[in-house]
Amino acid sequence: QHYPLGDMDGEDPMGELEIPSKSFYRQNGEPYTGKVKASVTFLDPRNISTATAAQSDLNFINDEGDTFPLRTYGMFSVDFTDEAASESLNVGKVKVHLDSTQVKMPEHVPMMKLWSLNPDTGLWEEEGDFRFESQRRKRREDRTFLVGNMEIRERRLFNLDVPESRRCFIKVRAYRSERFLPSEQIQGVVVSVINLEPRAGFSSNPRAWGRFDSVLTGPNGACLPAFCDDQSPDAYSAYVLASLAGEELEAVESSPKFNPNAIGVPQPYLNKLKYRRTDHEDPRVKKTAFQISMAKPRPNSAEESNGPIYAFENLQACEEAPPSAAHFRFYQIEGDRYDYNTVPFNEDDPMSWTEDYLAWWPKPMEFRACYIKVKIVGPLEVNVRSRNMGGTHRQTVGKLYGIRDVKSTRDRDQPNVSSACLEFKCSGMLYDQDRVDRTLVKVIPQGSCHRASVNSMLHEYLVNHLPLAVNNDTSEYTMLAPLDPLGHNYGIYTVTDQDPRTAKEIALGRCFDGSSDGSSRVMKSNVGVALTFNCVERQVGRQSAFQYLQSTSARPSPASTVRGRAPSRRQRASSGSQRQPRGVASLRFPGVAQQPLSN
């Protein structure tokens, strides 16, 4: 049986998998001779849109124990099950054929190896070498293939890679606003770089991406590894983007204004790097990434010695560079995300934790992040809120821990479908470690929505772990959060780490991917879902709450007191502090106590 790898229009496959008959066997070692259900997924580096779907940075550890980068010629995962899809099958003899004509850099051919991703370490491990083999394909010319052998014993991601040595570092910082103040730098931002293959005229494929890397910003920004070239400044280019808890940050504009002071890099080096934000030629494109030429700094050039590109051997200089040194910038924009903690806590500073029964994170240095995946079926993206209150603990019952708002992410392939990975307060021991609290969590889509379904395994778990929350309102969902970490089969994602930012990023990656061990930067709406809501667009002309309050005819008299709570408003706040969006006035009503956003 032959399985092609790659299906680019107008292009031959990168290669194929060849599996001889009678190669399958069960988990206990017994041969399997029945029908096989096969699934082969290939990430084709010739398609730039597949780069963000890569599950791991491309790194391996060499014989000396040093971490080195890889350049990929494609990644693939395989899943073989029996006819009933009840048991995963192992495969004893598998051949991987790589078309040598697809390897555009001749020096890479003898260096090509087959790698597999270790899910525990996140590093790639060598599976074997390739050998040359000439084959005559049907109705085609003779081709030379690189052939490697492997055995599939567990579900892993495999890779066709070569080690690469021409490396540099890119200095990037993230800020809370366009003021770019050093005091407003953000830690815990995931900054990612996609290394594009050399441009036309250089000895490689100008359309392919070769590497994906991600780094978390610290108190002094981040240094991202990327390929570079000192002989030809245009040889390699890099595509850089940044996100915080699923929220994309914005890069500094390059058109119509091109301000080196705002970008963070002085001339003439900036022109040499050819900085372009993604909307440079089309203002309709998102503004959340930029592309540069990876021109390695010349050692005898003063204007290139102070960043933002550093030679590989100058990593320490990159990491210790002051904010005044050249660097690229991202910043937060006012959006549809809101975080509120009853007990304030700065996630950039774990030492700001205080003892309190209502602390969102009850145990310092052991931060447990919990997310639930919510699918929205409807024409618009929707803000989804979690309202988190004490549920079973005598000190916290009925009291608010905090609120989280996030906007659903549109599915790339399905119209009228979006999904949200929504944080909620984990159940468990409170700060005194005396007894547990089952957090009462309300999941509330902010729109005209109707609950369509609840994950059957999650529902069964909650029924079997009493008490069971009441769910009479079909526009929302209420649960006493599970004590167990559960997993993607339930639509619940839980990660514990010494750093709250790291715990949240790992949990978010799993939630986006819909798996308990993988990670994705692309939302996969149909897998690992806990709740599904059907949402419709509000009717045109329907009176809003603000219009109602402004209407004199809607109130019996000017002296009347407005009863109930103030209407919620869209806003976002950085973790550790709440701030109001620009240009929105604070609305206060007589006789109504001001509260955090709530339903």
From Swiss-Prot:
Region Disordered, as annotated, extends over 550-599
What processing steps or modifications follow its translation? Cleaved into 2 chains possibly by a furin-like protease upon or preceding secretion.
Which keywords fit this entry according to its UniProt record? Extracellular matrix, Glycoprotein, Secreted
Q: Does the entry feature the keyword Secreted, yes or no? A: yes
Asked whether the UniProt record includes Glycoprotein among its keywords, one would answer: yes
Tissue-level expression: Specifically expressed in cartilage. Expressed at lower level in young cartilage than in adult cartilage. In adult cartilage, it is highly expressed throughout middeep zones.
Q: Under the cellular component aspect of Gene Ontology, which terms does the record hold?
A: extracellular region
UniProt induction comment: Up-regulated upon TGFB1 treatment, and down-regulated by IGF1.
Compositionally biased tracts (Polar residues): 550-560
Q: Which residues are glycosylated?
A: N47, N416, N472
Q: What subcellular compartments does it reside in?
A: Secreted, Extracellular space, Extracellular matrix
Q: Give the superkingdom in one word.
A: Eukaryota
Annotated Low complexity bias: 573-583
**Its job:** Probably plays a role in cartilage scaffolding. May act by antagonizing TGF-beta1 (TGFB1) and IGF1 functions. Has the ability to suppress IGF1-induced proliferation and sulfated proteoglycan synthesis, and inhibits ligand-induced IGF1R autophosphorylation. May inhibit TGFB1-mediated induction of cartilage matrix genes via its interaction with TGFB1. Overexpression may lead to impair chondrocyte growth and matrix repair and indirectly promote inorganic pyrophosphate (PPi) supersaturation in aging and osteoarthritis cartilage.
Give the record's subunit note: Monomer. Interacts with TGFB1.
Q: What is this protein called?
A: Cartilage intermediate layer protein 1
